[in-house]
């Protein structure tokens, strides 16, 4: 676990330990509990989970008491041993909840002076068919569009996004490029593990995304790779990671 003295920006409910035995159909995972029972948990992550979906690894589950839910358990995090035991957030719905709370509390210094109001899931883009994660507005200030991306793939201590080809991610970058300079825009990468110290685009997985990332920089879009330490108790904000414009320049 990555040690930190930072306060929690999110606290988990009581979590249940287990061991990952199988992930399948994207949304399902078989987890062995301490009792030896195998339960099927919801996997709230549609991506390939490159480099983090290791069978036999320790995991943590949350449990819902809602009788209407088909699956009571949700897979929240996994622990990997490289280079020291590190918890990695699996639930891709959680970063937006954490960032919303941080924005409301003005806990991201680079953005805190630029808004009075936080609006989630606002329509924008071509024919108004897309939704931005957060629109920040304030009197006398340009609108600030914030897109959040969960980031868990690494090479050493270098965090990389994306971990697979993402036409959706490409579209989001292009639409942010298109709204500048009429408005301001931020790409916020939620580094959902505490063992990374730098960030770069994942050119080797999605060269087109890497190209758009560099176009976004040239257009004036702000890049905020936010580092978080994850533990079964909660999530702590560690500040920004330095970033590189290409994967090759970031490796090493």
UniProtKB/Swiss-Prot annotation:
HAMAP family: SfsA. GO terms for molecular function: DNA binding. Gene3D superfamilies: 2.40.50.580, 3.40.1350.60. PANTHER family: SUGAR FERMENTATION STIMULATION PROTEIN A. InterPro entries: SfsA, SfsA_C, SfsA_N. Belongs to the SfsA family. This is Sugar fermentation stimulation protein homolog. Coiled coil: none annotated.
